């Protein structure tokens, strides 16, 4: 944060803490026409809940100045913290700065600290600012400039009426870094200035499952929450599994008791879900698998067909994965399976490329060629075409060879479009590997 103006944070102190309410405004026409999903608001809601700030409303507007102005006029009537994401780039449709200035009656002006920060960032990339990028240094008068540690577009915050407006870039990585480094300290100060946050911030624990339908997870957790307990149980299904959440309900009168209750309920979730539970918090399946491979000193090789390298991509997104991922082969055609993995052509002719026999041969083949501890394979029909009555779209076989001479294979029947089937196939393959690793403990 650059030279914060303490007047931005000053609010009359009260005898009891007042709950801070928030609204998020996601800006971008692509969010309204199916081009992109709004992941920023989910991240913001999670971070705000940790502070005890309740998100009451969420708006999504296109790249139209007047629409943004209208959204701000609505938000200021019902929220004390307004966080906007998007519209701070260098192109003509990036008009958040102009919209905030128009709505609040502030003038736009080029700020030295914003220009210097942007110029320094571009210089690191071997570039100089063009006319469009110079617009990113325009900041409403009276606003505090928020530094962007990873991108070129600075953010800003300013007081308008009884609300604090915070404007951040829409690029998720930039927004998240700025939220953590610039905005959260600002909001903590905001809470102190108004007499403190509610006594107990909203606490949320998240659990990730795979292999059970949402209805099955619900059945396992029936009766877990005592009647009248100040905790909500939530579930959200996705191609990656079912997410289960425990969330405390707003301001609590006995925080220690509620923390103890939440921990007791969390233990209940773990006990009831057992091995179906693969991670908690922000952990992903690929991170969990990576830790288990590292713990055992094992190295993996992959042979992928219908997933097209997705499993390898996910695993290598984790820093340090070179310690346990040796190689991956995308063997889409029958010829590739034979030439690269040594799968016998007559085996493919007899059982078909999508079969448990070929999945096993693929896993054994990649493991033997890589000379590693584990070979993991996947073959299937992702669709939309290629299915038959006997082998429909969504049929997937996964193979694992751990060097015992008896490879493991498992059949799945997934539903959804091509992308969903690929995602579920990659998750299922990693889950089979996870369970195999746990058995070796």
Predicted features and spans:
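Short alpha-helical segments enriched in small residues
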Residues: 255-441
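Accessory alpha-helical/coil subdomains and C-terminal extensions
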Residues: 159-240, 245-247, 257-262
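Glycine-rich phosphate/diphosphate-binding loop of Rossmann-like nucleotide-binding domains
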Residues: 17-59, 258-260
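Proline/glycine-rich low-complexity loops and linkers
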Residues: 67-73, 77, 94-191
